[in-house]
């Protein structure tokens, strides 16, 4: 039987090999593969987005037609961020709905709202 450390190392190595920022990407991939939460063209809010791996997965799933807004207390660095990604450094619990929705930019169609809200954080 493998140890917890070996399992952790497996997912860490997989994340590195596939170019994800962290192994947490596989958690969202697993959830979305089973539940089909994120669709092409969706507008996604990732609350507590650091280090950014859920944003990476969400961007792949929404395609160019969709948009992803990530907010976190920590700065999330992104080299050559796509135009359909907006990263906000701030407190999700203090952010106004308007400031989050502004992140949708030109992807604001129909009712101005998010189709999916993701979070892998603990708020306290």
Q: Predicted regions span which residues?
A:
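Short loop/turn motifs at secondary-structure junctions
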Residues: 40, 64, 112-113
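Conserved SAM-binding loop of SAM-dependent methyltransferases across substrates and taxa
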Residues: 51-63
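Class I SAM-dependent methyltransferase Rossmann-like catalytic core
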Residues: 1-40
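Short beta-strand element of Class I
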Residues: 65-69
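Conserved class I S-adenosyl-L-methionine
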Residues: 40-50
């Amino acid at each position: 039987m493998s140890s917890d450390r070996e399992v952790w190392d497996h997912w860490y190595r997989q994340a590195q090999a596939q170019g994800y920022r962290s192994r947490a990407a596989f958690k969202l991939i697993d959830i979305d593969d089973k539940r089909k939460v994120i669709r092409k063209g969706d507008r996604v809010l990732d609350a507590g987005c650091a280090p950014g791996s859920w944003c990476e997965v969400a961007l792949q799933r929404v395609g160019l037609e969709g948009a992803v807004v990530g907010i976190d207390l920590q700065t999330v660095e992104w080299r050559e961020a796509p135009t359909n990604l907006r990263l906000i450094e701030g407190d999700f619990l203090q952010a106004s709905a308007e400031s989050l929705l502004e992140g949708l930019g030109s992807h604001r169609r129909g009712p101005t709202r998010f189709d999916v809200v993701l979070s892998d954080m603990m708020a306290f």
